[in-house]
Design a protein with these regions (language model features):
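N-proximal low-complexity "stem/linker" segments adjacent to membrane-targeting elements
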Residues: 33-67, 71, 76-78
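Residue-level recognition of the N-termini of beta-strands and the immediately preceding loop/turn
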Residues: 43-45, 79-84, 109-110, 136-137, ...
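Donor nucleotide-sugar binding loop of glycosyltransferases
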Residues: 54-57, 91, 148
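Alpha-helix termini
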Residues: 68-79, 106, 131-136
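Short beta-strand/loop segment that forms part of the nucleotide-sugar
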Residues: 73-90, 113
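A conserved acidic beta->alpha catalytic loop
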Residues: 85-96, 145-146
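Acceptor/aglycone-binding surface of glycosyltransferases and processive sugar-polymer synthases
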Residues: 112-116, 120-130, 137-140, 146-214
């Protein structure tokens, strides 16, 4: 039996905690680990980053994302063909110029551009659809640096244990406006009233295995 509900896992994360759910194990488990426990090998990881008018943020954050990816490779946590997928959501500034220039000079950076601004969730979805056949797992994360990128280590550990969905969950909404907090609470109440299983305060910061994306 696999857990039906999400569970909280620990970690010293200042801005994000994480929850994970385990689906039916449709994904291939590549190796048998210690004492017969099935473990996945290191995945080809795609880090999907939606961007909209981020010409000031990208020069600051891209080196951090690349350094994180390099460290994960160096520590043998992810495969050498792992990469960043940057999604330009119809930016009106030089965001796409920055992405395309970096992609030309760094094989670990790839990018796609939406014809117009379609919204954050559509940008994330476009990135996931682009990478789903090119990776074993993806992690989607915002470009603004508010999420703790070191939480990726724990997400990858859970993936290697066989979990297909790992949620980032906000430990606090204090940075949100009163209106955003109020509408979020109303949204979660509505979902609960409709009988949906709700992961409260979950963020777009999450890991998905390739079978889930497909």
């Amino acid at each position: 039996m696999y857990p039906r509900h999400p569970f909280l896992f620990g970690g010293n994360f200042p801005n994000v905690k994480a929850r994970y759910t385990q689906m039916r194990r449709q994904a291939r488990l590549h190796e048998t680990g210690i004492m017969g426990v099935l473990m996945r090998t290191k995945p080809t990881l795609a880090i999907v980053i939606p961007c909209f008018n981020e010409e000031e943020t990208l020069p600051l954050m891209l080196p951090r994302f690349l350094a994180k990816l390099d460290r994960l490779m160096h520590e043998n946590r992810v495969a050498e063909d792992s990469f960043l997928m940057l999604v330009d959501d119809g930016s009106e500034d030089s965001t796409w110029d920055i992405i395309s220039a970096l992609a030309r000079h760094n094989s670990r950076v790839r990018g796609i551009r939406q014809s117009r601004n379609r919204g954050h969730q559509n940008a994330v979805l476009a990135g996931l659809m682009e990478v789903r056949d090119r990776c074993d797992a993806s992690i989607s994360i915002d470009c603004d640096g508010q999420d703790d990128i070191d939480a990726m280590d724990e997400m990858i550990s859970r993936y290697q244990e066989g979990f297909d969905v790992v949620y980032g969950v906000r430990s606090s909404r204090k940075a949100d406006t009163w209106l955003k907090r109020t509408t979020a609470q109303a949204f979660y109440r509505l979902l609960g009233w409709l009988g949906a299983e709700v992961v409260y305060n979950h963020a777009d910061y999450r890991l998905l295995s390739a079978p889930v994306m497909k």
